[in-house]
């Protein structure tokens, strides 16, 4: 197998791996209705109470009771807060559009019958409100207007008989996708209160609407601690009880990750906590964290705040929000290589003002940086192509005597000073760059809705007119033509089929990735053509010895 076939085979295998991951995700077993506990009994950290596992008394059409509602509008968010539970029931990100309908604002949290996704909080144990308690809330629309930097929406829960008051306040900040949830507990009673608040997400187990079958991206809970770092916990693992993650810590966060977006509760460091994930039945799951805030003596009060980030996976923003939150933007096993690639891409975009042109410029720069390596590979292929007639002659001479054929070929390579594998390593070194760039382009929410040229209005969506995939297919065929043809007719057919298969697959790939591939193909064709001419003009090789 020559170098070109090797690189095509590896990239084709990588593409098949992506398709396999997508198929596995689509074929995952439907969630059962049996709940699975997510936290071990007897743990030193606070444990979810059995009350939290009880089914909610709620209308059948939604699964969650509805109460008075406050609609909050800032410059970047539109949120709905419900007095029933004090939940954040709906959240729209005003700067982003839905994949299926560009006229609709992107919805992250959704209070629907079939696809609920909520942010909830409450207290473990009796005597304090949970996400099923009713709060006092002044309904209406709250707008962040004028020069105000922040907006507060207060909710109150009272137990007059026991002298306990809980104030939950949602704090919104201009220009930010972070919502602070401040809780103030006042104990005017005669007994101390155990403060073990929990913060969780409740979500359906399906992938977001509009996700491509051909491009698998992770959707599900994720936990981060200093000890275990970033841990994904698939819904299927939660369902069958095999979920593994760090349960207790004094740091970290819990989140729900999906393509381009993440929601995460970010408790402050040093507070003792327990993480949990469980199945609620009927296709619903919850993942959260319980904090140990200690006891509140009679006549005392205590205030604690937990930020909720719910927004795009913007690398710069995530890095500042919390340690390890930037890992929600998953680049896979090539993260160390992907980070500098995205850094370079972002710097170029700032200069040219267009992500499409930034991809083209970065592709050229990568090609120049790898030129010495790729030139060695292309030179080896050019020499092999020059020997193709002689190799064919040897095959005709020795027929099925493969031992003598291989011996004659080895002597020819030695005479012509050609190492048939000499170009493999340089080309193999380039493959991680392509894979890392693939993950960068797939994960970059900065390109969501970003246009390039004419018909390309969103670099993260497939080419609507299939122009780039067709160009990619044509250039891939030209590349095959420029390289030595396999002596085996079956291999030759496969080499011609692979570009067609690539074209079909890349119809469903993001336009930004296909744009990179097209530019890379064109540059590779130019480089290969020039090297072929150089080798062809270097003299005619001696005839084959038989």
UniProtKB/Swiss-Prot annotation:
Localisation per UniProt entry: Cell inner membrane
InterPro entries in the cross-refs: Membr_insert_YidC, Membr_insert_YidC_N, YidC/ALB3/OXA1/COX18, YidC/Oxa/ALB_C, YidC_ALB_C, YidC_periplasmic_sf
GO biological process, one term: protein transport
Spans traversing the lipid bilayer: 6-26, 351-371, 425-445, 465-482, 494-514
Gene3D superfamilies with a match to the protein in the record: 2.70.98.90
Entries under Pfam families matching the protein: 60KD_IMP, YidC_periplas
Low complexity compositional bias, start-end: 37-56
Molecular functions per Gene Ontology: membrane insertase activity
One Gene Ontology CC term in the entry: plasma membrane
Keyword annotations: Cell inner membrane, Cell membrane, Chaperone, Membrane, Protein transport, Transmembrane, Transmembrane helix, Transport
Protein topology in the membrane: Multi-pass membrane protein
Ranges where the record places region Disordered: 31-56
Disulfide pattern: none
Assembly, per entry: Interacts with the Sec translocase complex via SecD. Specifically interacts with transmembrane segments of nascent integral membrane proteins during membrane integration.
Function noted in UniProt: Required for the insertion and/or proper folding and/or complex formation of integral membrane proteins into the membrane. Involved in integration of membrane proteins that insert both dependently and independently of the Sec translocase complex, as well as at least some lipoproteins. Aids folding of multispanning membrane proteins.
Protein family (similarity comment): Belongs to the OXA1/ALB3/YidC family. Type 1 subfamily.
Protein's name in the database: Membrane protein insertase YidC
Organism: Thiobacillus denitrificans (strain ATCC 25259 / T1)
Species lineage: Bacteria, Pseudomonadati, Pseudomonadota, Betaproteobacteria, Nitrosomonadales
Gene: yidC
């Amino acid at each position: 197998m020559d170098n070109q076939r090797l690189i095509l085979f590896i990239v084709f295998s990588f593409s098949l791996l992506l398709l396999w991951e997508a198929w596995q995700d689509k074929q995952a077993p439907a969630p059962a209705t049996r709940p699975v506990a997510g936290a071990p009994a007897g743990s030193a950290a606070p444990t979810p109470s059995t009350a939290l596992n009880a089914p909610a008394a709620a209308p059948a059409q939604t699964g969650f009771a509805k109460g008075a509602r406050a609609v909050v509008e800032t410059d970047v968010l539109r949120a709905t807060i419900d007095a029933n539970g004090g939940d954040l029931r709906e959240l729209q990100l005003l700067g982003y559009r839905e994949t299926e309908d560009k006229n609709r604002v992107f919805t992250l949290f959704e209070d629907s019958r079939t696809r609920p996704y909520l942010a909830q909080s409450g207290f473990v144990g009796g005597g304090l409100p949970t996400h099923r308690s009713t709060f006092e809330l002044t309904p209406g629309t709250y707008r962040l207007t004028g020069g105000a930097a922040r907006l507060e929406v207060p909710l109150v829960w009272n137990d007059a008989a026991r002298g306990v008051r809980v104030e939950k306040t949602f704090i919104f900040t201009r220009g930010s996708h972070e919502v602070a949830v401040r809780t103030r507990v006042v104990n005017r009673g005669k007994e101390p209160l155990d403060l073990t608040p929990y913060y969780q997400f409740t979500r359906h187990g399906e992938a977001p609407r509009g996700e491509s079958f051909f491009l698998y991206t992770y959707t599900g809970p994720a936990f981060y601690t200093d000890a275990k770092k970033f841990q994904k916990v698939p819904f299927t693992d939660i369902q069958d009880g095999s979920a593994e993650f760090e349960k207790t810590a004094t740091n970290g966060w819990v989140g729900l990750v999906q393509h381009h977006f993440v929601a995460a509760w970010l408790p402050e460091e040093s507070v003792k906590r327990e993480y949990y994930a469980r199945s609620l039945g009927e296709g619903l799951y919850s993942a959260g964290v319980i904090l140990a805030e200690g006891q509140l003596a009679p006549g005392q009060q205590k205030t604690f705040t937990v930020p909720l980030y719910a927004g795009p996976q913007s690398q710069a923003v995530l890095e500042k929000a919390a340690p390890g939150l930037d890992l929600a933007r998953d680049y896979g096993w090539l993260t160390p290589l992907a980070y500098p690639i995205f850094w370079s891409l972002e710097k170029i975009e700032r200069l040219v003002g267009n992500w499409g042109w930034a991809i083209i410029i970065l592709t050229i720069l990568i090609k120049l940086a790898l030129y010495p390596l790729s030139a060695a590979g292309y030179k080896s292929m050019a020499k092999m192509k020059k020997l193709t007639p002689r190799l064919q002659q040897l095959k005709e001479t020795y027929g099925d005597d493969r031992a003598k054929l291989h011996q004659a070929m080895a002597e020819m390579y030695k005479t012509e000073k050609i190492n048939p594998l000499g170009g493999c390593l340089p080309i193999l070194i380039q493959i991680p760059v392509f894979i890392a760039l693939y993950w960068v382009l797939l994960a970059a929410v900065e390109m969501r809705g970003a246009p390039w040229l004419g018909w390309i209005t969103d670099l993260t969506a497939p080419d609507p007119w299939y122009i780039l995939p067709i160009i990619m297919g044509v250039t891939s065929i030209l590349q095959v033509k420029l390289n030595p043809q396999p002596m085996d007719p079956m291999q030759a057919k496969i080499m011609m089929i692979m570009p067609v298969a690539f074209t079909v697959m890349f119809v469903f790939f993001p336009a930004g990735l296909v744009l990179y591939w097209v530019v890379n193909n064109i540059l590779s064709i130019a480089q290969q053509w020039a090297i072929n001419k150089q080798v062809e003009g270097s003299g005619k090789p001696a005839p084959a010895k038989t």
